Amino acid sequence: MSRGLDALGDRFEACFPAGAPGWRTLGREAEFPVVHDDGTAADVRDLLPLLSRAQPSLRETREGGMLVALRNDRVEYTLEVGRGTLEVVVGPAQDLHELQARHEEARAPLLAAAKARGVHVLGYGIQPVTPATASLMTPKARYGVLLETIGEPWLWFTLTASDQVHVSISRDELVGATNLCNLLAPVTVALCANSPVFGGRDCGAASAREHQMGEILADTFRHGMPGAADADARALVRRLAEQDLLVLRRGGEIRAGGGTFSHHLAKLGGPDAPEAWDDFLLHEHYIWNTARPRSAIGTLELRAACQGPLHESGASAALGAGMVCAWRELQTFLDAELGDAAWPTMRRWHGAVIRHGLAADEPVPGLIAGILDRCETALDARGRSEGRLLAPLRRRLAARENPAQAALSALADGGIRGLVAHAART
């Protein structure tokens, strides 16, 4: 089946444009916890009618009769795994300034709807009080199947809220940029961790989101940093294919998979089987590495950031865009600083920053500053003054305090209600 997987790898690679990268466009998927005054999860389905009335151009998407999304040409509002979390999707945008303006334009009606319902939209990475239970899960069919196949660890998805940025990439840089951005996962976590409180208490990790999600099929590195760099697109697809196949779509219905995807492909008879490509795309959609290429839209998606403070919500997008724009320079920098020990060194640091944020020692003094410098240079080379959007991250680094550490201070000063007020501040 190795040849069959190589054929899939070639097809996957061909989904990205050939040649040198052109002008990079950007997109953003921002997930927001919505809570009551006491920090317990609100039901975001109550907000959808208000959003629809405020924006008549929004079109409904339903699943099994349930309203699951609203979208127009500017924005998409989508129910997340947890019924207390709403995702706001915008893009493609031509630069970070447009991306942020589009995001704020989309977020404003959400904040107004929440205010009308007496609930709070949080710039925070997890539900702070309500536990992960099946009753919190949005009743979409595929979520039920994933609970069946993964078990209770899947329920962490009902709590978490990430801030994902998409950056367009070319075929020639597909593997190099993906490897580099996966390697830089601890930098994103160090600067953008923001989920230290859930279940109503300090959980002992700056990014409980990354810590808990990392427990999902951890032996195969299904979430977060992969085990190692991939040599080429074929190797990338082979790695994905050795993961468990969790779900399949047949006749418009989602059902549980079984075994690895490579085993499933062999049963189909190889990559030329009518179902093979669509089955692979659904399979790889449910592998949650820090950086993952999205073949349908030709982007690299960066996933390590928790949802950040509302008044600094563009910072993680700027970081992700900078990493992709500067990936070659950053790879050279890491090779010089860490050499052959880069992956094991960064993996150890990843564990440290998940727990301690910017209080964790860097592997090499000045490593984060050097990375930010190269990101800023690459962004400014685009000629649109985007590098200045990294300023919140430089302030965090100078203070050695990321959003998680600030959230813990708010909890200490005012309890859960103080944390809610802090995380709802715009």
Positions of the model-derived regions?
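Loop-rich catalytic cores of soluble enzymes, especially ATP-dependent carboxylate-amine ligases
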Residues: 125-295
